[in-house]
């Protein structure tokens, strides 16, 4: 890389080439509740000031809306160090993960001290709208069966004053099935879910900032053939590469599903092979972990470019429980399966790859295609994949 000299203009107008100046960071301040009208025009003063690790945090009218430690750990520009453009980019990227903030602006001002050029750094942050509600209504038509669905969602972007995002959602759906003899034979579903997304979690031995997400989910489905309830809980780590923000990684540290079928009609039982009924329509646990990688080069600023997306996922379930069952000498049932609290648990490995591409024909038309490949293999405590992890052909995108 060729670095051109710094051109200095003298008072008489002449220009000379000199070495680039090195700037050291002097003072660093983080301003919350930044508003150009009140802070610049009216010269409003902060309500509270906190100093932590040599950095001044100036709180505004909303008080200590975000904990000082969270703001401090989001900043990579430190007093006494040389100015570095990379640390500025890292700071922008880190503050962008704080959903409690709307805008971030980093400013520098020159300060000459003992013949050394220094910079004062001010990080200006504006708060986002912390709470929001959403309502969705939709109509459905599945093979001539009409129905509707509705959901209500709530989100809080600063639950524990650390920019944690709390989300909750309830959903209901109803579908009138063709040929039903009474309203009670139609399909309906109810579900509720809640999750907390933490802005970052520094993972040992890695330099990426992980976001941690914990979630719980409950859903119940009623059909003429059966009634099924599913309780789920998960602990995930999510991160994006700083060098490639279009790539996303999700590591499912722990994913737990409990499937309960309190009712199955006799006619439905008679229509299924015994093995399918035994392994797919019985109560069971699914306890496992997995990893998902996704990439999408879509750019909303350039909608006329060809785009593609790739998604790869891998999941394993039941291995830890199976190992513990063998280690403790647990008894097997008549089918040769171990149980957890008297309930079967699934054991399998599963992988999926999806690829899609869109080719722009003109400003109104695109050609799109998609291909997906998936493989699942049950073993150990299972002879078939659980119904919730099985593959299907049909629906709006049927092949």
Regions found by a protein language model. Name each.
Residues 1-141, 171, 351, 372-374:
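Periplasmic polypeptide-binding modules associated with outer-membrane biogenesis and secretion
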Residues 64-65, 84-311:
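Gram-negative/organellar outer-membrane beta-barrel architecture
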Residues 79, 103, 162, 363-365:
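Secondary-structure boundary/capping signal
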Residues 2-35, 227-250, 363-394:
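Internal hydrophobic scaffold segments of catalytic domains
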Residues 5-8, 218-223, 315-319, 374-377:
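Short, internal active-site loops enriched in acidic
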Residues 39-50, 149, 226-238, 324-335, ...:
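Surface-exposed flexible segments
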Residues 6-9, 31-42, 109, 175-177, ...:
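Short regulatory "switch" loops immediately downstream of catalytic or recognition motifs
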Residues 43-46, 140-143, 250-399:
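C-terminal outer-membrane beta-barrel translocator/porin domains of Gram-negative envelope proteins
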């Amino acid at each position: 890389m060729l670095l051109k000299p710094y051109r200095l203009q003298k008072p008489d107008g002449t220009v000379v080439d000199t070495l680039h100046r090195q700037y050291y960071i002097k003072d660093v301040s983080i301003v919350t509740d930044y508003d150009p009208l009140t802070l610049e025009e009216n010269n409003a003063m902060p309500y509270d000031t906190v100093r932590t690790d040599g950095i001044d945090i100036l709180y505004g009218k909303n008080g200590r809306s975000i904990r000082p430690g969270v703001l401090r750990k989001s900043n990579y520009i430190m007093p006494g160090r040389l100015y570095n453009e990379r640390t500025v980019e890292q700071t922008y990227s880190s503050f962008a993960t704080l959903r409690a903030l709307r805008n971030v602006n980093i400013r520098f001002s020159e300060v000459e001290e003992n013949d050394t050029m220094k910079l004062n750094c001010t990080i200006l942050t504006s708060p986002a709208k912390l709470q929001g509600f959403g309502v969705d209504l939709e109509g459905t038509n599945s093979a001539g069966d009409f129905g509707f669905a509705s959901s209500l969602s709530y989100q809080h972007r600063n639950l524990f004053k650390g920019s944690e995002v709390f989300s909750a959602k309830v959903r209901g759906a109803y579908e009138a099935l063709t040929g039903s003899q009474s309203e009670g034979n139609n399909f309906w579903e109810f579900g509720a879910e809640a999750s907390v997304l933490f802005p970052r979690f520094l993972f040992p031995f890695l330099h990426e900032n992980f976001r941690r997400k914990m979630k719980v989910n409950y859903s119940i489905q009623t059909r003429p053939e059966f009634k099924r309830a599913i309780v789920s809980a998960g602990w995930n780590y999510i991160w994006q590469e700083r060098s490639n923000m279009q790539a996303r990684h999700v590591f499912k540290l722990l994913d737990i599903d409990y499937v309960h079928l309190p009712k199955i009609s006799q006619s439905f039982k008679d229509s299924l092979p015994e093995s399918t009924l035994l392994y797919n329509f019985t109560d069971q646990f699914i306890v496992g972990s997995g990893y998902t990688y996704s990439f999408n080069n879509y750019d909303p600023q350039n909608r006329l470019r060809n785009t593609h997306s790739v998604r790869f996922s891998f999941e394993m379930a039941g291995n830890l429980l199976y190992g513990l069952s063998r280690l403790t000498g647990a008894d097997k049932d008549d089918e040769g399966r171990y149980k957890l609290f008297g309930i079967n648990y699934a054991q399998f490995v599963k992988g999926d790859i999806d690829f899609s591409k869109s080719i722009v024909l003109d400003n109104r038309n695109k050609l799109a295609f998609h291909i997906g490949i998936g493989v699942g293999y049950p073993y150990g405590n299972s002879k078939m994949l659980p119904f919730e992890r099985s593959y299907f052909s049909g629906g709006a995108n049927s092949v």
